[in-house]
Amino acid sequence: MNPGDAQSIDRRCVRRSFDASAERYDEVAVLQREVADRLLERLEPVRVHPRRVLDLGAGTGYATRGLLRRYRKAEVHAVDLAPAMLQRVRRRAPWLRRPRCVCADLHALPYPDDSFELVFSNLALQWAEDLPTALRELQRVTAPEGAVMFATFGPETLHELRGAWAEVGDQARVHRFADKHDVGDRMLEAGFVDPVLDGESFTLTYAQPREVMRDLKALGASNADPGRPRGLLSPHRLARVEAAYRLAWRQPDGRVPATYEVVYGHAWGMGGTPQRADDTGEVRLDVHGIRRRRR
């Protein structure tokens, strides 16, 4: 994938969408919690003892609370673009040990150079308007011996929905995501040392295609491309999209899949050797619960 193949992002649209979804976000963020848990597990072999930790794109604070438990002596900062998300972080934080909540754009973080020994980001980088700039900011605030650990979405994410829209002549309704090779190249250009990227595929299953779109809206994961189609979607056009989705992807049990390709990345600020995670396969999931593949 070339850098220009990924869609551009309207940051104001991203902020509005996540602000609007904050109250319902935790009800539907099944995949986001699972990926956060796996990303937190990947910290176990990484030899860092941070004084300060950055949770970038903290959302409602699920991973923030995991970081507080793991690094009990560290000062944890929860950063998000959406103020309503940070209100949820504050509301759910431990009374005796609250994170520092900062509303900020990941393209211009309000911190000095080398501020954090650990930068953690769960499913936020895909919303960067300019990925190279965002990665340079992450590198800038990472201490020389600090580690960066993140997860983002890859290009196979929601390919079923994208294909259904293409069948009715509209490919711009579903966001396109950068692949791991492009992300790795951008990390090297940003100055990270020895970036390692791998990934795995998750499949959520739904009773109807409309439920896929309903969950995306509840998550705030709307298409933020400035060139996206505007205006209300007609019932007739929505019915055509659903029919195309079912025709191509309906499973024997009548449910339809929604695939998410998750790319994991980790590196060091200026030195050290990150630990490589184990290889993983595909995991199939019901929207009401996650079943982990036995290894």
UniProtKB/Swiss-Prot annotation:
UniProt EC number: 2.1.1.197
Protein name, UniProt field: Malonyl-[acyl-carrier protein] O-methyltransferase
GO molecular function, one term: malonyl-CoA methyltransferase activity
Gene: bioC
UniProt keyword Chloroplast present: no
Domain of life: Bacteria
Lineage: Bacteria, Pseudomonadati, Pseudomonadota, Gammaproteobacteria, Chromatiales
Gene3D superfamilies: Vaccinia Virus protein VP39
CDD domains referenced in this protein's UniProt entry, alphabetically: AdoMet_MTases
Pathway annotation from the record: Cofactor biosynthesis; biotin biosynthesis
Keyword annotations from UniProtKB, A to Z: Biotin biosynthesis, Methyltransferase, S-adenosyl-L-methionine, Transferase
InterPro entries: BioC, Malonyl-ACP_OMT, Methyltransf_11, SAM-dependent_MTases_sf
Record flagged with keyword Methyltransferase: yes
Function summary: Converts the free carboxyl group of a malonyl-thioester to its methyl ester by transfer of a methyl group from S-adenosyl-L-methionine (SAM). It allows to synthesize pimeloyl-ACP via the fatty acid synthetic pathway.
Sequence similarity: Belongs to the methyltransferase superfamily.
Catalytic activity: malonyl-[ACP] + S-adenosyl-L-methionine = malonyl-[ACP] methyl ester + S-adenosyl-L-homocysteine
Spans traversing the lipid bilayer: none
